[in-house]
Design a protein with these regions (language model features):
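Helix-to-loop junction immediately C-terminal to a conserved catalytic motif
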Residues: 46
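Conserved ABC ATPase "signature" region
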Residues: 95, 109-127, 144
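Conserved ABC ATPase signature
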Residues: 131-135, 139
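Catalytic Walker B motif of ABC-type/P-loop ATPase nucleotide-binding domains
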Residues: 156-160
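ABC ATPase nucleotide-binding domains
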Residues: 227-245
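Conserved ABC transporter NBD signature motif
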Residues: 22, 54-64, 71, 130
Length: 245
């Protein structure tokens, strides 16, 4: 079974004739140099970039033709960063993820149950009453992830989710994404090839808007491909890469 299928997919800038097929579960990372088209591809999958050339379907329907509310119940998107200007609590931010289900001003029992479940999954229950603006980078990222999970999506799309995290929180986040990917599709854009190598079920590498490699981490992240696409020499040591300029 598949969720996203794209054929000859292109955009005004950053993407050219990309064809892909994503399953209903698993952790897929999209890597590549700056300007390779990673965020453009993710934006098309998330329904945020249109019009696009070619075809991109989710669950058999063209992404651009999905009703926004219905699509948001099935596909969750996490941008690189989220800023809150007002003093929302963690729990209030998490409940914002239920917006696609909202039928009025008040939260339902199902909304609260979904938020509780998401905060438990992301280990954010302990600070549910705190002002979101006071959180550390790692805490804030887990809260935003919890908000996305309250949508109870079939696909979770993340644009460089580890960018502002230290190494410990990067590893913790990707372990969690790996667990989530056992039951839903997780697609994450990353610049960190070590995270892609260690945690992905599948890696897609983009170069100049085209797919340069697509397969298991071991198949794709070879020294030859890394040298050609990224312009650096890579050596694998015990499941981790080291680089030379």
């Amino acid at each position: 079974m598949t969720s996203f299928i794209a054929g000859q997919l292109g955009f005004t800038y950053g993407l050219h004739e990309a064809s892909l097929e994503f399953p209903q579960s698993g952790l897929i990372t999209i890597a590549g140099p700056n300007g390779a088209g990673k965020s453009t591809l993710l934006g098309i999958l998330a329904g945020l970039r249109s019009p696009y050339r070619g075809s991109c379907t989710f669950a058999g329907r063209e992404v651009a033709q999905w009703p926004k509310r219905e699509f948001a119940r099935r596909v969750a998107f996490l941008p690189q960063s989220v800023r809150m200007e007002f003093p929302f609590t963690v729990e209030e931010v998490v409940l914002m993820g239920r917006t696609p289900y909202a039928s009025g001003w008040f939260q339902t029992a199902e909304d609260r149950s979904a938020a509780e479940e998401a905060m438990t999954t992301t280990d954010t229950l302990a600070f549910r009453g705190r002002d979101f603006r006071t959180l550390s980078g790692g805490e804030a990222q887990r809260v935003i992830l919890a908000s996305a999970l309250t949508q109870r999506p079939e696909a979770l799309l993340l644009d460089e989710p580890a960018t502002h995290l230290d190494l410990r929180h990067q590893l913790s986040l990707y372990r969690l994404l790996g667990e989530l990917a056992k039951s839903l599709l997780v697609v994450a854009v990353t610049h960190d090839l070590n995270l892609a190598l260690r945690f992905s079920n599948r890696v897609m590498v983009l170069e100049d808007g085209r797919i340069a490699g697509d397969g298991t981490p071991e198949e794709v992240l070879t020294a030859a491909l890394i040298a050609r696409v990224f312009g650096v020499q890579a050596t694998l040591h015990g499941g981790w890469m080291s680089y030379e300029g």
